[in-house]
């Protein structure tokens, strides 16, 4: 079955057919850089990172573009509050964005255009819309006339009279200069109170700065051309942002902006939509700095279908931690047991690198993984395949620790492990030789070994009661100790 994707534009799941065979042009709306990224951003960029990875794994050459909105009222307001400048604020949070995404193992985009990089292209695009009658200038501002574009509303499925102005929080629907409440700004005249934080740009309509929506239209056009394959973002961007992008770009070029529009679902916190007003707003860095493994967060996001809402709660995070431990143990299998199984390349520097592994193009697990991903990127079903492989490796690891040898042939185990590692990398789930497995209760390998040493010391001192207490404590936490004939102690997870 070929890859099929749910297209917001058509409201149907459709076979994916790129404009140019073997090549994909993909644009993702990036962040407005006035604050640290939150968990909603984490979900969105993890999802689109996986889409890109899967397309590349499937043989496509993907050009992936993701912008930064570095001109916006929110940035200007923060700059004024901090007695800083728009550029200083945006530079700081662009750097913070990259730090957060690196921790989440999100691949770098091919290019990160900024709105400030494309001011000439923005002005040219606005002029085209004015010349063609889709936009009008009033006192230094330029507005898009939504009633001039017959297809306005086709992405969100709304009629013009059903829409609510100001849905983005960036539009003043009471502005008397506008002909229609839904008309939106393409160019904003400079205001005296803003001049201390940014230098306005010259334009045919006077000094000012671009509006939010026109920035993306100009960046898509410059980096990818008039028509692209995939345009993606969060569901909150469907209206008005993506609706307005379509209106601008398609009015100017007379061509479809994108063939496939993909949108990920919302993030809820303890059952409520995450928002600053409710006080349940969580940033990525604060969440990860609390001790959460970034790969666990990534796994948590991918265990739900990308179009459905997900709920961050104590219960769901705990469940995800348990799931990551299981998968982590499977991914570490080669590092933990490769030498004991006498895999010939164990000492090679490339050992464990998925790019250097040779796995078959077909096989039951690979075909099931591919079928899941081809079905509108069903990562939940794809991860179920990974868990089956990881649990099998976990059982074999317990046998090696307990009996000294596995049940399966070492080369068969090697094939299972390499398949798991390679498929997990398609989802961006990775470990390294230095990765330390953390038990469900929070005990690290080092902590377990320390307790074992305490037990051995107690037994050496003939304090058998203390030794039994430590053994029982570990047992309640899912750790079984196996005393060896030579006096050493091995441990396995139950």
UniProtKB/Swiss-Prot annotation:
Cofactor note: Binds 1 zinc ion per subunit.
Chain ranges for the short sequence motif 'KMSKS' region as given in the UniProt record: 273-277
Substrates-to-products reaction catalysed: tRNA(Cys) + L-cysteine + ATP = L-cysteinyl-tRNA(Cys) + AMP + diphosphate
Motif position, 'HIGH' region: 31-41
GO biological process assignments: cysteinyl-tRNA aminoacylation
Signal peptide: none
Residue numbers binding Zn(2+): 29, 216, 241, 245
GO cellular component: cytosol
SMART domains attached to this UniProt entry: DALR_2
Domain of life: Bacteria
One Pfam family of this chain: CysS_C
Coiled-coil features, chain-numbered ranges: none
Cofactor(s) recorded in Swiss-Prot or TrEMBL: Zn(2+)
Subunit structure: Monomer.
Family to which the UniProt record says this protein belongs: Belongs to the class-I aminoacyl-tRNA synthetase family.
Listed name of the protein: Cysteine--tRNA ligase
Species of the source: Cyanothece sp. (strain PCC 7425 / ATCC 29141)
